[in-house]
Curated annotation (Swiss-Prot):
Transmembrane segments: none annotated. It is found in: Virion; Host nucleus. Mediates the nuclear export of encapsidated genomic RNAs (ribonucleoproteins, RNPs). Acts as an adapter between viral RNPs complexes and the nuclear export machinery of the cell. Possesses no intrinsic RNA-binding activity, but includes a C-terminal M1-binding domain. This domain is believed to allow recognition of RNPs bound to the protein M1. This is Nuclear export protein. Average number present in a viral particle is estimated to be 130-200 molecules. It comes from the Viruses. GO terms for cellular component: host cell nucleus; virion component. HAMAP family: INFV_NEP. Its main location: virion.
Length: 121
């Protein structure tokens, strides 16, 4: 797992939490929850790849891991669209920077998850 990605997740989550305090927006809380869930999934998939014979363990533990993988890609696409929408409507430069970094992070994580999943197949 790339330490830069981990610190990027932490930075984005901290920034979004600060934005949430200054906003009454409930959908931002949902985005934060989705980011946290995505980070945990990415980390667990990365750990499975690190152990490399762990495919059978992963399949035994979760027989529907391919379905779950598809759902995670749908979540990523949803988050990308939400972040793009937020980026279009916000005029606050702090929020714009945060959403641009979040968007970049989502693209990186999507690529990492694709790479991990191809290694497991």
């Amino acid at each position: 797992m790339d330490p830069n990605t981990v610190s990027s997740f932490q930075d984005i989550l901290m920034r979004m939490s600060k934005m949430q305090l200054g906003s009454s927006s409930g959908d931002l809380n949902g985005m934060i929850t989705q980011f946290e869930s995505l980070k945990l999934y990415r980390d667990s998939l990365g750990e499975a790849v690190m152990r490399m014979g762990d495919l059978h363990s992963l399949q035994n533990r979760n027989g529907k891991w391919r379905e779950q993988l598809g759902q995670k890609f749908e979540e990523i696409r949803w988050l990308i669209e939400e972040v793009r929408h937020k980026l279009k409507i916000t005029e606050n430069s702090f929020e714009q920077i945060t959403f641009m970094q979040a968007l970049q992070l989502l693209f990186e994580v999507e690529q990492e998850i694709r790479t991990f999943s191809f290694q497991l197949i």
